[in-house]
């Protein structure tokens, strides 16, 4: 049975796509919510008794605008044991941010990793997911497309 109670007031705009991670390293899961306009909203979890609630921190996380249809994903794509933030868009663009752990005290300090996905021929649709599909120890990427097909990109470590 769906229970929207902890998410009352949490909106991302049209075509909301949530991703969950501990952004401020306080031990509670926070939300990044992508939307149709290409922006991502940042919500931090606050506890009210034993019920989680979320507070809007930023309407445009990292001042990011990926065009249309921001799809945030969290995955350790470079095997450094830190969560990377990968954002797909409806225009076939993927942006990658990696945390700068040495600068982060109580929060993730994200830095754009330019060119990480540039050599790939990405489809329009940009809804990536990451999983070790070939069981070789690194994360591969599957992207859902505007046409309804799925495209597989094997991570070869290059």
Residue ranges: model-predicted function:
Residues 15, 37, 69, 82, ...:
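Extracellular structured ligand-interaction cores
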């Amino acid at each position: 049975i769906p229970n929207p109670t902890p998410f009352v007031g949490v909106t991302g705009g049209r075509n909301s796509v949530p991703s969950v991670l501990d952004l401020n390293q306080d031990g509670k899961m926070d939300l990044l919510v992508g939307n149709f306009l290409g922006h991502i909203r940042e919500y931090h979890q606050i506890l009210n008794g034993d019920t989680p609630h979320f507070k809007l921190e930023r309407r445009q996380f990292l001042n990011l605008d990926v065009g249309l249809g921001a799809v945030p994903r969290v995955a350790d794509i470079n095997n450094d044991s830190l969560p990377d933030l990968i954002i797909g868009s409806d225009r076939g663009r993927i942006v990658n941010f990696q945390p700068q752990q040495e600068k982060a005290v109580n929060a993730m300090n994200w830095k754009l990793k330019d060119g990480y996905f540039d050599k790939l021929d990405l489809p329009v649709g940009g809804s990536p997911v990451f999983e070790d599909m070939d069981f070789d120890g690194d994360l591969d990427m599957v992207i859902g497309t505007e046409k309804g097909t799925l495209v597989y990109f094997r991570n070869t470590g290059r």
